[in-house]
């Protein structure tokens, strides 16, 4: 029989009886259990060092593991063992997915993404490893990363080595462009020379390719979808469900911070004549200039529009945490972000505000891996209340569900809430790899302070420390080859425990802690849950010489990405692109669809198109097309073209356009050119590059562009050009 404390016996009996007698337990995490909104969990330690977790879903026996913690909290120690057990289950000899090799196993000593996701996905793997999995099985991590990098199979498309952007919105890259997260995760594994050589080759080639196809030199930002938040209408306006062109031409905080991190890595590793350090510095400045909102004290999740990017009153914790951890946000902004981004008793939402009309998945949810990045950000900002909040949220979620789950509903921290069509989380996998990485990061870095560079810098909130130390004088992390021992201070008068002195003896590092008082960042608990619903496209009436825009109650008009006070717009030849939001309860909705007013020249046919521009100066090109080579939500066959404009007496200008998968005829992303003088111009479309060109996508069998061969195609019906202000 396992050895169980008397209090644990009572709790385990109550759980077995349905939990009725435990209703009086306070919500939260204790040393040996957790309770929240009537659900409870308890853990007991057996004589052999193994654990038994009892929770509403049953019991789970957890074997002893290679890495061990010794604290006064059986829950803390047992959940660390559970994370390692989950990692072992995610360590496989073969991977599979219905969309690849017809669902047949593909040999790979790899990590799978989770119980319900038995494949290797670029961003999931990369964030998981970056959070700490690289320490536990580095060779398996390298194998997994190697599966997500590829050469080129398309003749004439070069011989580069590129990171794969997984199947995704509108046909993948360059609509989604966060594949550079691969470098953030894989940077921890470069002690292997062969792996490091391929890493450097892929780094140089991928950054060069993204500079051509995703970088907007005028704004200084990279285009593309938010990292991780890739279920379009969950976080973008609902009208992007069937047309992702807006997403393709928009700019996301998280994706730009990941590019910043990749450029910083390149600056430290590559010596090929490119000024990566200068590019990184310029990108950091552009992020701070374009995404920061002083009125909110946070960076926006994304910005976008047809002429100039409009602000969107929406925020996501992954992007914010990455900005803090990477140094894009200085210490003052880091503290403002943590003070202004709201939390709920169960944890921190991945987006805010939530969408009233969307089911629970990214919307209205807690994702443990995002909470782990929030924990890392809180440590960078010396914010003990936030450090403790994230740690307790991660422990509570794992304990109450008996595994490191993919996600939780925000208010209840349940793995399913029944709300009819809004029920969710829509998908929720046990032993989700990045949730496993999150818990391991919580222990190794979040509590014991072991940083990626192997420095040890614990920052323990006093309230949490009392649970972990109890009557013990020290707590220990034992990796099998290294021991970290944290010694309790004589007093805990402050709010944060940090290093006082240290001693290294062989493989053991002793850290004596001291209590200090830092200026804490309070948890924001007063935020409204939902954003206002976004309005329909604006109604515009031609008044003869001017256009009148009808606003709904609470409506706010934007013209070319800027708030406009007047709703009557004098006719102009140059573009006036209008959208509307709703302000309510101090929040602003997402934008309506946009309507553009102005003089349009229509150019019929497939091109090339020769025309005489009506104005000199900036001009916008859009192409009318159909691309039904895959569904809107996935695939690898976004059509990509390099649009070239040659005007009389002027140099050739080249810009990239993207023609995403769609369900009807639609328009491409815009290309912006400068007309130097009046005269004839010719626009032609040249071949580009998409993910179907990568050799590794020969495994893809769900749709076109995979096993059937590379495909970068769309039916072009014509183009339009409009002068810009």
Predicted regions and their residues:
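Recognizes extended acidic, P/S/T-rich segments that occur
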Residues: 552-574
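Acidic/polar, glycine-enriched structural segments that form the non-catalytic walls/loops
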Residues: 25-118, 194, 198-201, 205-212, ...
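Extracytoplasmic
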Residues: 561, 571-577, 581-725
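Bacterial N-terminal signal peptides
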Residues: 10-20
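Non-catalytic carbohydrate-binding regions of carbohydrate-active enzymes
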Residues: 271, 275-301, 333-482
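Extended glycan-interaction surfaces of carbohydrate-active proteins
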Residues: 70-119, 143-172, 215-250, 285-367, ...
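Aromatic-rich carbohydrate-recognition surfaces in CAZymes
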Residues: 118-226, 252-260, 365-378, 384-392, ...
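Pro/Thr/Ser/Gly-rich low-complexity, intrinsically disordered linker/stalk tracts
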Residues: 519-552, 586-602
């Amino acid at each position: 029989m396992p050895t169980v404390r008397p209090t644990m016996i009572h709790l385990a009996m109550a759980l077995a009886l349905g939990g009725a007698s435990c209703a009086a337990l306070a919500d939260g995490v204790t040393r040996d259990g957790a309770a929240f909104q009537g659900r409870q969990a308890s853990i007991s330690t057996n004589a052999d060092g193994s654990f038994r977790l009892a929770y509403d879903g049953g019991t789970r026996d957890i074997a002893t593991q290679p890495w061990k913690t010794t604290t006064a909290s059986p829950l803390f120690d047992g959940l660390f063992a559970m994370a390692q057990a989950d990692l072992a289950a995610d360590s496989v000899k073969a991977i599979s997915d219905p969309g690849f090799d017809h669902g047949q196993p593909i040999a790979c000593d790899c990590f799978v993404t989770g119980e319900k996701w038995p494949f290797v996905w670029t961003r999931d793997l990369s964030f998981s490893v970056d959070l700490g999995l690289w320490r536990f099985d580095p060779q398996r991590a390298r194998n997994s990363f190697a599966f997500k990098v590829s050469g080129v199979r398309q003749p004439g498309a070069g011989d580069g080595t590129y990171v794969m952007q997984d199947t995704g919105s509108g046909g993948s890259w360059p609509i989604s462009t966060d594949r550079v997260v691969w470098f953030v995760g894989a940077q921890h594994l470069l002690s292997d020379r062969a792996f490091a050589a391929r890493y450097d080759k892929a780094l140089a080639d991928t950054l060069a390719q993204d500079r051509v196809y995703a970088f907007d030199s005028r704004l200084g930002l990279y285009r593309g979808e938010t990292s991780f938040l890739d279920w379009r209408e969950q976080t973008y306006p609902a009208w992007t469900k069937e047309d992702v062109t807006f997403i393709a031409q928009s700019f996301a905080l998280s994706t730009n911070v990941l590019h910043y991190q990749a450029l910083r890595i390149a600056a430290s590793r590559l010596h090929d004549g490119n000024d990566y350090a200068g590019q990184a510095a310029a990108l950091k400045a552009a992020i701070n200039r374009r995404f920061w909102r002083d009125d909110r004290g946070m960076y926006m999740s994304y910005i976008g529009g047809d002429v100039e990017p409009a602000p969107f009153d929406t925020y996501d914790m992954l992007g914010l945490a990455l900005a803090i951890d990477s140094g894009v946000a200085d210490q003052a902004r880091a503290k403002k972000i943590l003070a202004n981004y709201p939390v709920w008793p169960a944890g921190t939402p991945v987006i805010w505000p939530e969408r009233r009309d969307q089911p629970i998945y990214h919307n209205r949810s807690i994702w443990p891996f995002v909470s782990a990045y929030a924990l890392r950000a809180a440590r960078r900002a010396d914010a003990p209340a936030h450090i403790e909040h994230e740690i307790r949220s991660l422990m509570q979620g794992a304990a109450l569900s008996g595994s490191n789950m993919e996600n939780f509903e925000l208010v209840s921290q349940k793995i399913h809430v029944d709300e009819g069509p809004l029920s969710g989380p829509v998908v929720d996998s046990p032993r989700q790899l990045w949730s496993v990485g999150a818990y391991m990061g919580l222990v190794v870095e979040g509590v014991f302070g072991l940083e990626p560079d192997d420095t040890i810098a614990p920052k323990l909130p006093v309230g949490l420390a009392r649970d972990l130390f109890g009557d013990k004088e020290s707590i220990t992390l034992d990796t099998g080859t290294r021991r970290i021992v944290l010694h309790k201070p004589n007093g805990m008068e402050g709010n944060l425990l940090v290093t006082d002195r240290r001693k290294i003896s062989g493989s053991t590092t002793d850290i004596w802690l001291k209590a200090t008082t830092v200026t804490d960042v309070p948890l924001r608990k007063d935020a409204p849950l939902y954003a206002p619903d976004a309005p329909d496209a604006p109604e515009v009436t031609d008044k003869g010489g001017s256009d009148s825009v009808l606003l709904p109650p609470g409506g706010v008009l934007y013209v070319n990405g800027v708030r406009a006070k007047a709703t009557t717009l004098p006719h102009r030849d140059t573009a006036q692109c209008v959208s509307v939001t709703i302000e309510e309860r101090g929040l602003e909705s997402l934008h309506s669809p946009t309507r553009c007013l102005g003089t349009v020249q229509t150019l019929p046919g497939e091109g090339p198109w020769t025309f005489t521009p009506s104005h000199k100066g900036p001009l916008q090109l859009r192409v009318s097309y159909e691309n039904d080579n895959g569904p809107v939500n996935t695939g690898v066959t976004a059509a990509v073209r390099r649009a070239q404009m040659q005007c009389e007496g002027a140099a050739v200008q080249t810009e990239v356009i993207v023609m995403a998968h769609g369900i009807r005829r639609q328009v491409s992303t815009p290309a912006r050119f400068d007309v130097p003088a009046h005269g004839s111009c010719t626009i032609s479309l040249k071949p580009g590059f998409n993910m179907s060109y990568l050799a590794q996508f020969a495994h893809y069998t769900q749709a076109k562009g995979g096993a059937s061969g590379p495909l970068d195609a769309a039916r072009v019906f014509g183009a339009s050009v409009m002068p810009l202000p």
